[in-house]
Regions:
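Acidic (Asp/Glu)-rich catalytic clusters
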Residues: 1-8, 41-44, 94, 116-123
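Outer-envelope exported proteins of Gram-negative bacteria
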Residues: 8-10, 49-52, 101-105
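Active-site mouth loops of central-metabolism enzymes
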Residues: 19-33, 73-81
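Short, acidic/polar
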Residues: 27-43, 83-88, 112-116
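Active-site groove signature of glycoside hydrolases
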Residues: 41-64
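Beta/alpha (TIM)-barrel catalytic core signal, keyed to glycine-rich beta->alpha loops juxtaposed to Asp/Glu
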Residues: 56-262, 267, 271
Length: 271
């Protein structure tokens, strides 16, 4: 229908280890087909615009896993074969009209290149996006992944651009508002550290010096990055959504970006 054509529906197949989803099975051709059929039924649609692979079977360094990340236990031939079979299945599903584009998530530079090269074997098929964490405090995408995605024409869909709401300052001074995310996840998946608390305080002061709301600074900064496709934000209520949308036309000037980079150099990788 015309109304459906106006929508862009994106969903994922969950990765290995989610015991409540497919008994924790990883991402394999059979699992992909079952998951897509389930999503089509649940979403009551004939096709999915963007279908994403949530987490590599081999694991990755995201969600603060880079502090102890060790890829040497991986078997290169096994990983390459899995990627080959997964891409073939996704291509078949595209030919069947069930998906339009494919994306990665929580992927590494090596994994992105493998998927991109495999997709090039098929006509009119490529990796459209990668959904990884990116924010004022989390900028590990800026190096190898930025270069990889530039050359492979893969756009970043940034999740947690507001650092789980931390950038607002509502958790400073050990505050834990009732029903907040921090009240449910005590360390916010490793985001709550002395350095992140210090950095957030300084970004809030930076926002004030330019008469900006820290939410607008955070989202506008992400949008300013050359590799950005879109920014995924969350809002728990209408007031939060109104505040976010109020800054949709804000574009940061060079002097603001220079101060952001200066602060990031001062407190690099704060979480």
């Amino acid at each position: 229908s015309q109304k459906r054509k106006e929508l862009v529906i994106a969903t994922k197949i969950s990765g290995k280890g989610y015991k409540n989803v497919r008994n924790g099975k990883g991402i394999f051709p059979k699992e992909i087909r079952l998951a897509i059929e389930g999503s089509l039924k649940n979403l009551q649609t004939d096709y999915i615009d963007l279908y994403q692979l949530h987490w590599p079977n081999r694991g990755s360094y995201h969600f603060r896993q880079y502090w102890n990340y060790d890829p040497t236990s991986q078997e290169s031939s096994v990983e390459r074969e899995n990627i080959e079979l997964v891409v073939k299945e996704l291509y078949d599903l595209k030919k069947e009209g069930k998906i339009r584009y494919i994306g990665l998530s929580n992927e590494t530079a090596w994994g992105t290149v493998q998927f991109a090269n495999e997709a090039k074997k098929y006509n009119d098929f490529s990796i459209a996006s990668i959904q990884n964490e990116y924010s004022l405090l989390c900028r590990i995408f800026d190096t190898d992944l930025a270069e990889t995605c530039f050359h492979e024409n893969v756009k970043l869909l940034a999740y947690s651009p507001l650092v789980g709401g931390m950038i607002t300052g509502k958790y400073l001074n050990s505050q834990v508002p009732e029903n907040s995310r921090l009240s449910r996840v005590p360390d916010m998946f490793g985001r709550v550290t002395p350095n992140s608390t210090r950095a957030i305080g300084e970004y809030i002061e930076l926002s004030k010096s330019f008469e900006l709301d820290p939410v607008h600074l955070a989202l506008s900064f992400c949008r300013s990055r050359p590799f950005m496709g879109s920014v995924i934000f969350g809002a728990s209520n209408v007031d939060q959504l109104k505040l976010i949308l109020k800054g949709k036309d804000i574009y940061l000037k060079d002097d603001v970006l220079a101060e952001v980079n200066k602060l990031y150099k001062k407190i690099p990788m704060p979480m």
